[in-house]
A protein has these predicted regions:
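Eukaryotic tandem repeat interaction scaffolds
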Residues: 321, 352-362, 379, 384-397, ...
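Structural signature of tandem alpha-helical TPR/SEL1-like repeats
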Residues: 7-24, 45-58, 79-92, 112-126, ...
Length: 468
């Protein structure tokens, strides 16, 4: 039996002999179209583009309806980056032979390379019409159906490619990737996320049965298991990804998040830093690294990475929010306020940004602003216990007696065990200081109710010193 090397040598000799015989045939009959086409095809397969082009030009001159000749010339022009010429030649080929699946498919690939996606979709569809068992055409068509409104169509095309060819690794992988996010539009155009993670896991596991070195499938499984808090499985697949691709910034990023969840902060920091060495423009990596560095007592480096986060993504409200908190901790109140405001400008329903900005304004004794921001926090979340409680503290003035009383009571209604709300409500009721409608100060103590809330405070914490 011939070895692989011997087999290659034999093929080379056969091709060489074939070329000699074809050239001899053409010498005898220069108009021998089939000989020229076969010689051109042999030269093209060996990368001799100039010689191949010469033969195919002769072919289409001899027969101006020779679709395969125009097709091969189109492939050569595309290889030479003569895109306009290639396109014209593809058009001639598909006009003459519109039901040739291979020509339609390769024209689709050419258009995809030019980013003419709608036209590529048209030709992949025509390839499928010509050959309904053309798995690669279904796959390439699915790959271009990226709009959420085409979700079902993309899914069906991936599944058809796999039905035809069950060992189609890429089709299984990209089907898994599609259903993992489940981003689609319903009939009225509303954007939905309906992930099918079990289905995705099945797809990725099939990929790994076909090829256990398919690193991206390990990565996706690691991401899914991390979301499910199955940290051992997540860790296993993410480390396998890294073993197969040491430069995988995504694997390093997700390993960092898993390590953080497991309270292995130092390990998490190492993974995130390594991730940035391979891809420095990941705003999420900078964000999580910034938070971790702050937790590990390096607030300045934390700020550096959060600043990089907002440089890379100027609309990321959470980064502005945490920057504000870090600046507030450093007692840079002006920068803190500025960044809380930036968070709110990007997310008008950012409850915690309103809340902490309200607390900051209270600390700075800017009480009207403090009141406004705390009210905004409550507006975004009407069950926000701490919001009602702190608004009650802000309204600690005889002119706002009724409103403060209402805030404390609301906080207690939502969270009956909120000790400090009971305590400050009791203080307010026992003081009884309020204003009449005409602005005259008056004291009307509510001692019975005050006593009730003091007692409740003691029940919640018998050692609470302020009441004793």
């Amino acid at each position: 039996m011939a070895t692989r090397a011997q087999g290659k040598k034999i093929k080379k000799v056969v091709k060489k002999d074939a070329k000699i015989h074809l050239r001899q045939a053409i010498k005898i009959d220069p108009d021998f179209l089939d000989a020229r086409y076969e010689l051109g095809s042999l030269l093209l397969s060996e990368g001799e583009l100039k010689g191949a082009e010469e033969q195919f030009n002769k072919v289409v001159k001899l027969d101006n309806n020779h679709a395969e000749g125009y097709y091969k010339l189109a492939l050569i022009s595309a290889e030479n980056r003569k895109n306009k010429k290639a396109r014209d030649l593809f058009e001639k080929a598909v006009t003459i032979k519109f039901d040739d699946a291979k020509i339609q498919f390769d024209y689709g690939l050419f258009l995809k390379k030019l980013k003419k996606y709608e036209e590529a979709i048209e030709h992949f569809t025509k390839a499928i019409e010509a050959n309904q068992n053309f798995s690669e055409a279904y796959f390439e068509l699915a790959m271009l159906l990226k709009d959420p409104e085409d979700y079902d169509r993309a899914k069906k095309n991936y599944e058809t490619a796999i039905d035809i060819r069950p060992d189609y690794g890429d089709a299984n992988y990209y089907l898994g990737k599609l259903v993992m996010t489940g981003i689609q539009k319903d009939s009225d155009g509303t954007l939905l996320s309906q992930p099918e993670t079990d289905y995705a896991v099945t797809c990725f596991e099939k990929v790994l049965k076909i090829d256990d070195t398919y690193s991206k499938a390990h990565l996706r499984l690691g991401m899914i298991y991390a979301d499910r808090d199955e940290h051992d499985e997540a860790n296993k697949h993410l480390r396998l990804t890294l073993k197969l691709n040491t430069r995988s910034s995504k694997a390093l990023y997700h390993l960092g998040l898993v390590s953080k969840t497991l309270s292995k902060e130092k390990e998490a920091i190492k993974f995130l830093k390594r991730s940035l060495t391979h891809y420095s423009k990941s705003y999420l990596t900078h964000f999580h690294l910034g938070l971790l560095l702050k937790e590990n007592q390096d607030i300045d480096k934390g700020i550096t990475h959060l600043n990089k986060t907002v440089e890379l993504n100027q609309e990321f409200d959470e980064a502005y929010y945490y920057l504000a908190k870090f600046f507030e901790e450093k007692e840079d109140h002006e920068s803190a306020k500025e960044h809380y405001m930036k968070a709110i400008a990007r997310n008008h329903k950012h409850r915690d940004a309103y809340y902490h900005l309200g607390l900051l304004m209270k600390k700075l004794n800017v009480m009207e602003e403090a009141k406004t921001y705390m009210e905004k926090a409550i507006e975004t979340d009407q069950n926000f216990t701490k919001g009602y409680y702190h608004l009650g503290l802000i309204l600690n003035d005889p002119s706002n007696y009724a409103d403060a009383r209402k805030c404390y009571l609301t906080a207690i209604d939502i969270e009956p065990s909120f000790l400090m709300a009971h305590y400050h409500l009791a203080n307010l009721l026992s003081s009884g200081q309020r204003l009449k409608k005409d602005g005259t100060p008056v004291i009307r103590k509510e001692l019975k109710l005050a006593k009730k809330h003091y007692i409740e405070s003691l029940r919640l914490d018998p050692k609470f010193p302020k009441i004793h």
